[in-house]
């Protein structure tokens, strides 16, 4: 069957888990809380010799009501306003070299949003799975993110940032948003600053 209000939904990816976490975030932000991600994705599932099907399946339409939680998404203006807001921590999920501006950035201008902290999405993972909760929490505590009331995560285009967002949600932070436009949008506006260095 399709997705109903009481359906348990599990997303998985045949590639990097960020594609599943992006789908998870979209449904989660639409008010559907019975949604999960298969840790390790299809690769781990296959490595464990679990059942697979080649059947495409046929499903009737579901009746899920969308109750969008607008607080789970922010735009360019809200992200810019957060730069000087001590109650909001902005985190960049890209690789350290991209964050600092030292590595090539195919989005355009190099650097990161002012006052944002670098929490590379890959540091949340271990062999394709999320790290244990205590390790995730340590990541966010050591970076100074954990005690902040609200967190905005961004990346290149709103995909890998959902790894950080899910990690925060898994350890109990309930006020996380994604800047959906991320660097793909930010770099195009020359009036918006970018900071280089770590």
Feature map (PLM): residue ranges:
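Short, well-ordered beta-to-alpha junction loops that form the rim of enzyme active sites
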Residues: 14, 93-95, 155-156
């Amino acid at each position: 069957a399709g997705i109903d209000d009481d359906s348990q939904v599990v997303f998985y990816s045949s590639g990097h888990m960020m594609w599943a976490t992006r789908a998870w975030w979209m449904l989660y932000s639409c008010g559907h809380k019975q949604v999960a991600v298969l840790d390790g994705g299809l690769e781990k599932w296959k490595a464990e010799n679990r059942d697979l099907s080649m059947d495409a399946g046929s499903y009737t339409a579901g009746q899920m009501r969308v109750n969008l939680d607008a607080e789970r998404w922010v735009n360019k203006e809200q992200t810019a306003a957060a730069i000087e807001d001590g109650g909001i921590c902005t985190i960049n999920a890209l690789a350290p070299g991209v964050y600092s501006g030292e590595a090539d950035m195919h989005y355009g201008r190099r650097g990161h949003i002012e006052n944002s902290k670098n929490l590379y999405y890959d540091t949340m993972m271990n062999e394709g799975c999320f790290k244990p909760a205590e390790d995730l929490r340590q990541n966010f505590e050591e970076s100074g993110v954990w005690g902040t009331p609200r967190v905005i995560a961004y990346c290149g285009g709103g995909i890998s940032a959902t790894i950080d967002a899910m990690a925060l949600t898994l350890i109990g932070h309930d006020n996380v948003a994604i800047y959906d436009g991320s660097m793909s949008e930010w770099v195009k506006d020359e009036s918006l600053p970018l900071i280089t260095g770590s």
